[in-house]
Amino acid sequence: MFDDMVNLFNLGAFSDEEKELLRTDFTYKKQMSRLLKEARQAAKRDTCYFCGKSVTSFCNSHSVPRFCLENIATNGDVLTLNTVVDNPLMDTENGVNKAGTFHLICNDCDSKIFSDYENPDNYSNQPTPKMIAQMALKNSLKSISKRLFEIEFFNISAKKTDAARMFSDAKNAANEMDLKEYVDSYKKAKKALEKNSSVDYYVCYYEKLNYVVPIAFQCSLALSVDFNGNIINNIYNPSPEYRIQNIHISILPLKSETVIVMFIEDGDKRYRQFYKQFNKLTLDDKLAALTLIMFMYSEDMYFSKSIENEVRESKALCEAGKTGQDIISFTPFFDPLEILRESHSLDKRHEIPNLLSEKYKLS
């Protein structure tokens, strides 16, 4: 069971035989369900993360604005990355009410602090600095929630076997570092929102498409390489002084249009070459790059059933969806950064269906 707990966080790690066993082994499913429930309960707070007030229930917050999910849903359902990953421990389909949700703040705070960017009427023009700060705040909260859960999950699994303890200790050492950085980003976003600052974030790309794309996405990502293969984030740097830098990407399908926003924290200079290279691409090439980046770096994308066949039948998309950053070189003869460059090469955008292009539009 320990290997399966590890594979829950290692997309695409199961063999076909293991997948079939996990789909039919109801005893195992019950054990895993209990473990996940225990981890969620252990990670649950008794105060709102934003205002600090005691609460008995939390808001069902969405990482992607609910109205965007509704715009691409079929009978209230959207597909997840598991459509290509095929991990038997993950859902392939989610109802809009459960897609990308987290429970960290109270209903009152959720309704107030995200009110600007979660209003579809506010996208007639480029998002305001306040809306950008709200996006950054939401991304930070989602990341914090995810890491709090994973820390408890691995704390619990560490009690199972010695092997589980060794793996869990190593995983949680990284999780704790991630959590600290997410909390720092959260504090920055909260401060920017409270003072209505226009200088804390730099919007490096904004586009409004005159059609509805079949994908809804909002996340902060730590890109590894740029278009020329230069390292942006060295995930192997052991120094506690080295800070991973994230880029925020939002792909928001409206009723008849789509808004795309990409921004960074002001001062995050490692992305400078990346966004300069990106902005020189044609529109189609930009959309292909964004499609690849979503599949390669995040699990938190949701898409319409209208493109299910295209997604399932693309071997390149499936491989991109299974790409992880836990890449380790087990021999001194191989440079892990070279492996990272190859596995995360943005040249692969030419091999995948460009799901953000007009060809796949919903309307």
Predicted regions and their residues:
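Non-membrane alpha-helical secondary structure
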Residues: 1, 24, 129, 133-136, ...
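Phenylalanine-focused residue identity feature
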Residues: 2, 9, 14, 26, ...
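An N-terminal structural lobe/cap that precedes and organizes the functional/catalytic core
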Residues: 2-119, 124
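Internal, well-ordered alpha/beta segment that forms a basic, Gly-enriched binding/recognition surface
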Residues: 77-179
